[in-house]
C-alpha cells in the first residue's frame, strides 16, 4: 500500500459517523433526531470539480447525516458531451438516438454518480439521488 493510500485509509477510518452509519441501517437517534443532508443543483460536468467533492465531504463531516438526499440537477446535462442525447423538452419526440449513444450516456451518468457519491461511500452514509430537468 502506498503512503498516500495508507494515509487516506487511516483518515477515512477516523471520520465521524452518524448513528445510522455506525449501525449499518437507517436509525433514529435516542434523542429522536434523524439528520438529513440535502444537496441540490450541483450541476457539474463529467469532470466533477474537486471543490465540489471537498464541499460534500466537509458537509458530511460537519453534519454527520443519517441520510444524504441529492434532489435534482446534479449533472449539467446541457454540456456538449451530452449533445447527442439531450432533449430540450421531455414531451417532444427524441431524435433518433442510437442504442450505442444511450449506453454511452448511461455509462457516463454512472461514472458521474460514482464520483459524486465517493465521499458518502467512504463514510458509509446512505444516499439517494433524484434527477431533475438538467440530468
Question: What does each model-identified segment do?
Answer:
Residues 1-50, 56:
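Mobile, glycine- and charge-enriched loop segments
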Residues 46, 50-135:
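Core catalytic region of metal-dependent phosphoesterases/phosphodiesterases
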